[in-house]
């Protein structure tokens, strides 16, 4: 038997498989990245050049930044970005505080009816979001919190899914650490902040990033609860650009605003992508 021939055939098959894999990954990458490329390209085209194209061009020979100037001057986009930042930071901080305490209670504390209460919590995930939005809107309106940051923030300060995810991570920490801490007269809160949170930091960071993305991209709730420009978020800004006339006509300027809004989230993901993967991996591992 010619082992060298067999080895060459195996290497050839491996090389062909690798080429096919790279081609498929390249095609998938193009499909994923093309919408963002098109958005950036359109934002760099002048109004006249964009409307003169009968067939949209995949490049531009005369890029311009005027659309970005229009995005900030036609509407107070800077103020909307600041409002979104305030909403995102406060909401995320409050949610992390709430879900951390709730997850710790379900994971480590013993109290009557714990399993029943947790089951009821999980059952809330079965309720359609549309019903929750209606209930939240009615409640916030009755409390006279429309057009306030408090009205924007309150419905988003907890998440059953994140409580469940963090509880599962807390339960992966050996019980011996908890018992040893109790022997040393360590309080539950001190054990939580000194032991559990540092160990489960990757998952907590992942939750923070996912919540930041969720808040930054909020669309339905801000439109329902605010009709005062003082409390508009970036999603309201995009809608305002379209409604005030130039957004419908001047697509390049609207794309420029979308690029500005998207860049912070893209940078956030690129910076913390390893921690996100670590948190997801830990969340899917038992023991």
Language-model region placement:
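A hydrophobic, multi-pass inner-membrane permease signature
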Residues: 2-287
